[in-house]
C-alpha cells in the first residue's frame, strides 16, 4: 500500500509503511520484474512513552484500563510481547490484560488502551473465582514497556519505560456529579472554572464527556485527573450555568454515572438504563 507520483522521467512510489531492510521486494512494470531490497537504515531512537493514565500513584484494585501515550506513531501487533505487569517481587502477573487481537489504538497510533481482563474484576465470574484478581489491595506493581517496542518507522524506544504504582481497595461506587465541588470564577472575567471530583476519573472520557452548557473554551484535567479546569473563550456572565455530564463518564474502575461497573451478570435485567446527560447548575457572580 502506498502512493504514486511522477517526478520528471521517474515514477516514485511512497509506501504507507517503512519497508524493513530484510524484506525482499519486487517492482513490476511492462510485464517485467525488478527485484530490490530496501537500503539498511540507521536506527534512530527518538520515540518514548510520554504519559500513562491514570497518573495517580495509587489506583483501585479493580482498575479497568491504562492509557499509554507515545511521542510518535507506533507499529501495531507488539503489545502483548512488549508490555508486562510485574508484582512487588518482580514476577510477571500472568494474563493481567485482556489480550485481544485488535489492539486498541487511537487514529494516530500514538495512544494505546490496555484493558484489564474484566473477568478478573467482576465478582461472581469464573476467571476471578478461579485465578483471582490481577491487582491486590496493599500491593505495589510495576508497568514495564520494553525498549524494543518499535515505532512505525521500525525503530526501538529511547529507553525502557517503568511506572510503579500502589493498589488501594476496590471501588464499587458509581460516579456522583452532584457531589463535586466548584471553585467559581468571577463574572466579567475569563478566570478558569475548577471542579473537584470526588475521585479521579477516566482521563480520555472526562475530557470528552463533560462540558458547560452554551459555553466554548478549553478543558483540561489536573491533580491526577481528579480536577476539571475549564477556561472559557469569552467572559463569564453574571448568571446561572450548567455543567453537563454524559452518563457514560467512568471512574478508574469503570463505574459510570449512577451505575456501578460490577453489576450482577446472572440476574435478569428488568430496567434499561439509557445513556443521558446529568446537568449540575452553578451560578457565577
Question: What is each model feature region?
Answer:
Residues 1-285:
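Acidic, low-complexity Ser/Thr/Gly/Pro-rich repeat segments typical of extracellular/periplasmic
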Amino acid at each position: 500500500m502506498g502512493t504514486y507520483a511522477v517526478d520528471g522521467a521517474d515514477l516514485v512510489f511512497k509506501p504507507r509503511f517503512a519497508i524493513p531492510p530484510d524484506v525482499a521486494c519486487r517492482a513490476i512494470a511492462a510485464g517485467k520484474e525488478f527485484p530490490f531490497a530496501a537500503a539498511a537504515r540507521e536506527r534512530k531512537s527518538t520515540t518514548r512513552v510520554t504519559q500513562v493514565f491514570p497518573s495517580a500513584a495509587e489506583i483501585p484494585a479493580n482498575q479497568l484500563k491504562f492509557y499509554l501515550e507515545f511521542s510518535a506513531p507506533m507499529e501495531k501487533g507488539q503489545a502483548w510481547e512488549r508490555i508486562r505487569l510485574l508484582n512487588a517481587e518482580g514476577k510477571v502477573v500472568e494474563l493481567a490484560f485482556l489480550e485481544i487481537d485488535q489492539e486498541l489504538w487511537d487514529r494516530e497510533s500514538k495512544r494505546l488502551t490496555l484493558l484489564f481482563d474484566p473477568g478478573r474484576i467482576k465478582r461472581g465470574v469464573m476467571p476471578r473465582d478461579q485465578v483471582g484478581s490481577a491487582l491486590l489491595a496493599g500491593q505495589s506493581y510495576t508497568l514495564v514497556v520494553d525498549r524494543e517496542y518499535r515505532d512505525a518507522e521500525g525503530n526501538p524506544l529511547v529507553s525502557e519505560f517503568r511506572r510503579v504504582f500502589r493498589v488501594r481497595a476496590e471501588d464499587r461506587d458509581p460516579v456522583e456529579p452532584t457531589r463535586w465541588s466548584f471553585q467559581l470564577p468571577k463574572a466579567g472575567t475569563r478566570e478558569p472554572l475548577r471542579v473537584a471530583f470526588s475521585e479521579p476519573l477516566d482521563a480520555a472520557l472526562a475530557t470528552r464527556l463533560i462540558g458547560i452548557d452554551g459555553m466554548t473554551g478549553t478543558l483540561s484535567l489536573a491533580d491526577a485527573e481528579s480536577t476539571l479546569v475549564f477556561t472559557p473563550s469569552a467572559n463569564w456572565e453574571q448568571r446561572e450555568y450548567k455543567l453537563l455530564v454524559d452518563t457514560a463518564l467512568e471512574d478508574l474502575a469503570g463505574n459510570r454515572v449512577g451505575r456501578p461497573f460490577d453489576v450482577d451478570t446472572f440476574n435478569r435485567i428488568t430496567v434499561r438504563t439509557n445513556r443521558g446527560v446529568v446537568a449540575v447548575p452553578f451560578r457565577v457572580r
